[in-house]
């Protein structure tokens, strides 16, 4: 399993996680343009991004989600309470791109467990990602 922090801090957050050449993003709180530039620096093709999973609705975690999902034609994964908050913010997405998850998801061949966390928002989650040989926790 591999991961890379693409952005961190109050100006935006995003993490790339993957196994082999399959990848997904945790959040996209930076512009799609900046995120794509960061992927290029890592030699990761945007075509290898299979989706975006959202941890919570703050703008520094979702700022670029809508544009990136439309541009790459990839799904966005979020819990029902999160979709209620982010749907009006993300802009027009095809219904097939809006994936509602509960406490578990499978993305880019990896199993992902959502763990509720305490934060100053309606719904917030940490993630436990299970790879072939390693497990990654992100909160």
Q: What name fits each language-model region?
A:
Residues 1-42, 125-139:
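Conserved beta-strand hairpin/beta-sheet module of binuclear metal-dependent hydrolase folds
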Residues 7, 28-30, 57, 81, ...:
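Active-site metal-binding loops of divalent metal-dependent hydrolases
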Residues 32-78:
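Active-site metal-binding motif and surrounding structural segment of the metallo-beta-lactamase
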């Amino acid at each position: 399993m591999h991961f890379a922090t693409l952005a961190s801090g109050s100006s935006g957050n995003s993490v790339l996680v993957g196994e082999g050449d399959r990848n997904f993003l945790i959040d996209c709180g930076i512009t799609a343009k900046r995120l794509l530039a960061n992927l290029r620096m890592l030699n990761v093709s945007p075509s290898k991004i299979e989706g975006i999973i959202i941890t919570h609705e703050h703008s520094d975690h979702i700022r670029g989600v809508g544009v990136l999902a439309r541009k790459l034609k990839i799904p966005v994964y979020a819990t029902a309470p999160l979709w209620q908050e982010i749907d009006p913010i993300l802009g027009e997405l095809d219904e097939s791109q809006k994936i509602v998850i509960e406490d578990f998801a499978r993305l880019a061949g990896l199993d992902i467990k959502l763990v509720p966390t305490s934060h100053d928002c309606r719904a917030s989650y940490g993630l436990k990602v299970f790879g072939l040989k390693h497990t990654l926790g992100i909160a």
